[in-house]
């Protein structure tokens, strides 16, 4: 009798976990579908890095404009422009521009556009906590890397229940470092200049141009 009860309990628990995993996958699929439906996306964000053991605490703000695979990212005093073929990294402090090619087929290459859909592969996902943040219902999905060599322990992805937009991303490393990216503003289908993703060299007359390829 005890064995029957134990087996029944294990089966019920397995079904419950499977159902939670399926709910998480369905939610992530909805997020991906909605993001891909926009012509362009403009995001203002806050980035925090903390490691209590190493006494590290850093806060930064940034913004990114995306259209397809093109983007302009402003973060930590550096501007990165990707026009679909070349990557331009502009560093005013050093008066330098680095130009390089990007292999779009390289899955390991992290780009702003991939940050909104990175969770589609390489992770085991499950539903986590539901929080009320400033009147918004934020559903968290826990992502655990399937690669044992990954230095990240887990990622909590906060999703606005109503809009299905990503609210924040909390990444915990195996060595205790926690990084949090919080979306302060998420705008879509904005009027953009036709030269929004074009690098104009004449704007940087005294800069050193470093062409890597």
Describe the residue ranges of each PLM region.
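Surface-exposed, polar helix/loop patches in the mature regions of secreted/periplasmic/lumenal proteins
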Residues: 86-144
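An acidic-aromatic
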Residues: 61-109, 179-180
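One face of beta-strands
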Residues: 41-47, 60-64, 71-73, 153
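Positively charged n-region of N-terminal signal peptides that target proteins for export
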Residues: 1-4, 20
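Sec-dependent signal peptide hydrophobic core
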Residues: 5-9
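N-terminal leader/targeting segments and the immediate start of mature chains
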Residues: 11, 15-56, 69, 208-213
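Gly/Pro-enriched, hydrophobic low-complexity segments
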Residues: 126-204, 209-212
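Beta-turn initiation residues at beta-strand->coil junctions
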Residues: 47, 91-92, 170-173
């Amino acid at each position: 009798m005890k064995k029957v009860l134990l087996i029944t309990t294990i089966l019920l628990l397995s079904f419950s976990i499977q159902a939670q995993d399926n709910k998480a996958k369905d939610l992530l699929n909805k997020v991906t579908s909605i993001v891909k439906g926009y012509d362009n996306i403009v995001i203002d964000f806050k980035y925090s890095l903390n490691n209590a053991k190493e006494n590290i605490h850093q806060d930064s703000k940034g913004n990114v404009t995306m259209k397809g695979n093109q983007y302009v990212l402003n973060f930590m005093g550096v501007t990165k422009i990707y026009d679909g073929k070349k990557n331009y990294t502009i560093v005013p402090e050093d008066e330098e521009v680095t130009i390089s090619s990007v292999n779009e087929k390289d899955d390991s290459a992290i780009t702003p556009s991939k940050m909104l859909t990175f969770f589609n592969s390489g992770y085991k996902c499950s539903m986590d906590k539901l929080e009320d943040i400033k009147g918004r219902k934020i559903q968290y999905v826990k992502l655990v890397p399937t690669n044992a060599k990954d230095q990240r322990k887990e990622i909590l992805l906060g999703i606005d229940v109503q809009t299905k937009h990503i609210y924040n991303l909390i990444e915990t490393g195996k060595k205790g470092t926690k990084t949090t990216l919080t979306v302060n503003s998420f705008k879509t289908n904005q009027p953009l200049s036709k030269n929004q993703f074009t690098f104009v060299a004449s704007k940087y007359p005294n800069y050193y141009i470093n062409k890597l390829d």
